[in-house]
Amino acid sequence: MERTQVQIPAAQLDRQRDFEAKLKEMHADRPPRALVDTFGCQQNVADSQYIMGMLRAMGCSFTDDPAQADVVVLNTCAIRDHAEKRVYGNLGALTHTKKANPQQVICLCGCMAQRPEVAEKVRQSYRHVDLVFGPQALWKFPELLYQVYTQRRRVFSVADEHGAIAEGMPVVREGRTRAWVSIMYGCNNFCSYCIVPYVRGRERSRDPERIIDEVRELVADGFREITLLGQNVNSYGKDLGTGYDFADLLTDLDKIEGDYLLRFMSSQPKDATYKLFDVMAASRHVAKQLHLPVQSGCDRVLRAMNRPYDVARYLDLITYARRVMPDLVLTSDVIIGFPGETESEAMETVALVEKVRFDALFTFIFSPRPGTPAAKMEDPVPREEKQRWFDRLCAVQNGISEELHRQYVGQTLRCLVDGESDDARWPLTARTAGGRLVHCTGDRADLGEYRDVKITDSNTWALFGTIE
């Protein structure tokens, strides 16, 4: 495949560093405070780290209080209606902080902002919002913010710039435990329910040398867990035109010396390969964890979703993956109540879940996204009926998860301690190599470290144990 993406020229990126310096000088007498609120997926988390990096280069400090913030950035998600409603609710609340501080600059970015109808709604109904820009304009954030300050006008930048990759942006990563590394952007799959290809553009792969250098630096800086991000990591490299694929990238990353784990998300079954599973099985650093969204256990529904695989293909993939990785932790996504789905078809999905026995399942009732083919499909089944199917699915999966977790009681697992808990009995949280949540004993000295945890109890959602 001919490569369609281009790197943003270094001169244009340097221009953004100049705007950062100008903004820092502009506010030298009183450095501004910024708040970045992130909605949605890990790709948005990674994008917010770049936004924070640029804000810090402008001289900003950070706050969690909107009333104290001079710059507020909402990095939004367009995948589901619930996330959009939360964003609009937050925008409404910001009218009060803007009245109290008229100089406050409010920015809306991310996938919602890329949708023309959202940008127009904000333009007309949320006039206190100063800056709106989509994911493809993230690298121009300093210039856009400079325009807001110097031209004293609202700025909208949602142009279609699907072919651009920006390297070398400043970044702020919290702590030294986990890091997110984008290896590609966009999606070519056009699942009929999904808005992502319309707001994040077509697939563009970063050069492998850039990714390897970034991961090597993170390991040298002491990061313990690095997650490789892409809407479909299994199609990484197709646009490079070299034959170098995701399995090759994992092979090269695994050569980096250090005490760390590599994870990745998300995967598309149509592009998953035996080669990838063989590389995972043989690697020293790649977690034996696979998130492989199935979405439905009914072939007809999969076709309606424009998911180009069938149930037999999916089962073949996971059978092979489990054969070469007996300790594999397998998770998935399922949508219940897709337009036109019948109860018997929904129960095919439940039957698949019973057969596969996923370690965990992320389940959703269909949420129509304006601008997608599925939003125009006839959907005669009432929400109450879909909820009944959904509850049945969740009950089955919860039983499976509880049973699988119970098998770990009495074992000692190596875990990365990554957070603190409000529960005095279990003051720390950790993750196993397979990504299972563990609540455990310990103190702050354990944060960011690998520890052996003796599992003493479990429930549907987590394990519990003591650090040995």
Task: Go through each PLM region and give its residues.
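Short flexible coil/turn linkers enriched for glycine and charged/polar residues
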Residues: 174-177, 187-189, 286, 296, ...
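Proteins enriched for Cys/Gly/acidic motifs involved in redox and nucleic-acid/cofactor modification
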Residues: 1-236, 275, 290, 312-323, ...
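Terminal RNA-binding accessory module
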Residues: 1, 19, 376-468
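Conserved SAM/AdoMet-binding glycine-rich loop
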Residues: 106-108, 115-117, 220-348, 354
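Radical SAM enzyme [4Fe-4S]-AdoMet core and its adjacent flexible, acidic
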Residues: 41, 237-258, 305-308, 368-399
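Conserved, mostly hydrophobic/aromatic
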Residues: 191, 211, 228, 264, ...
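Generic beta-strand/beta-sheet core signal
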Residues: 37-39, 196, 229-231, 265-267, ...
